[in-house]
UniProtKB/Swiss-Prot annotation:
Species this chain originates from: Bos taurus (Bovine)
Quaternary structure and partners: Heteropentamer, formed by a combination of alpha (GABRA1-6), beta (GABRB1-3), gamma (GABRG1-3), delta (GABRD), epsilon (GABRE), rho (GABRR1-3), pi (GABRP) and theta (GABRQ) chains, each subunit exhibiting distinct physiological and pharmacological properties.
Written domain comment of the UniProt record: GABAARs subunits share a common topological structure: a peptide sequence made up of a long extracellular N-terminal, four transmembrane domains, intracellular or cytoplasmic domain located between the third and the fourth transmembrane domains.
Family assignment from sequence similarity: Belongs to the ligand-gated ion channel (TC 1.A.9) family. Gamma-aminobutyric acid receptor (TC 1.A.9.5) subfamily. GABRP sub-subfamily.
GO molecular function annotation: GABA-A receptor activity; GABA-gated chloride ion channel activity
NCBIfam families to which the protein is assigned, alphabetical: LIC
InterPro entries: GABAA/Glycine_rcpt, GABAAp_rcpt, GABAAR_pi_TM, Neur_chan_lig-bd, Neur_chan_lig-bd_sf, Neur_channel, Neuro-gated_channel_TM_sf, Neuro_actylchol_rec
Alphabetical keyword list: Cell membrane, Chloride, Chloride channel, Disulfide bond, Glycoprotein, Ion channel, Ion transport, Membrane, Signal, Transmembrane, Transmembrane helix, Transport
Domain of life: Eukaryota
Extracellular topological segments: 24-241, 291-301
Protein name per UniProt: Gamma-aminobutyric acid receptor subunit pi
Amino acid sequence: MKRSLHLTFVCLSLFSARMCVQGNQFNIEVSRSNKLSLPGFENLTAGYNKFLRPNFGGEPVQIALTLDVASISSISESNMDYTATIYLRQRWTDQRLVFEGNKSFTLDARLVEFLWVPDTYIVESKKSFLHEVTVGNRLIRLFSNGTVLYALRITTTVACNMDLSKYPMDTQTCKLQLESWGYDGNDVEFSWLRGNDSVRGLENLRLAQYTIQQYFTSVTRSQQETGNYTRLVLQFELQRNVLYFILETYVPSTFLVVLSWVSFWISLDSVPARTCIGVTTVLSMTTLMIGSRTSLPNTNCFIKAIDVYLGICFSFVFGALLEYAVAHYSSLQQMAAKDRGKAKEVEEVNITNIINSSISSFKRKISFASIEISGDNVDYSDLTMKTSDKVKFVFRDKLGRIVDYFTIQNPSNVDRYSKLLFPLIFMLANVFYWAYYMYF
């Protein structure tokens, strides 16, 4: 019996001590230089219902926001999103938290659970989290007139629709939108505290591939099935730094095009040298094109500006290889034609000699009284040609002229014209390319 009473006494003592500790935690008093004692949190929130908004049933709560952008850690073209760390600060007035004096005091972040706070969320956010090191990165500050300051440190990944048709000379416009999840415009009204000056930190950011050109804030309305909501919008423009891509892709591809032109100054007879240059430049351009497309694996549905330029360079490199094939083939054809001409001349001389010898022999063996056969006065007027033979002769003559018209008479002129036309056309293509993608 005594043991039972002893255990009961110990339990009551421990419970009393526990209640005293909890009471001390909620009895918050802040002393200023003038020794003003602020009310305890427990007394201030007596009868407070955190499940009801301020002015419940009356005017909507006016919530003013400010935003500090600490960092933009990544911008993904493949996933079309960006990841940013922000400091979000919200201010509103809750008349239930008015106390005497003109001072303010900061509460432990864990006491936020006992107050009403807005259900603000980030529109189009894929994932977000509140920092918890070393404690939850939240701040709650009460002012004597009932104003509440609620600050959070959040890292969020937000969707950003990107148009990559001008990549890498593109400028992307991304948004950060804030809205109440459950309270519509009849309960909560959001606003920027100081307009564009409500957002800070963007002008100081240094990004790897982008430069922040400008940003501005706005307030819009979001009409949804559950009501009409106030939406705060931060819109900022990101201009890509093209210098990196010029050094990585544009300069090497241009050098490969120029390298392919070296073959124009090599003799047509140097088949291995010209073939090696042509094949090497084509393979190198193919590698560049594959590397460019694999760097953005999920954006291959876009025909990007860099793809257009690499396509132009590949056309010129492949064209230089085809130019040698045409010139070399024409050279072989010309040599074959010369050989055929010489053989034909020899054949004609042989035929003429045979005919002349045959006529001379015929003259000696046969003689006619009324006809004198002579090589000079033979009349061929009675020899006629059939109509079908005439048609074949005319057709062959026309076909031969057409073939001669498209046949390169001097293959060395192919290289001579290519030395001028290839660089000239490539320069014009560059002028149109850069003018279009930089200014249109």
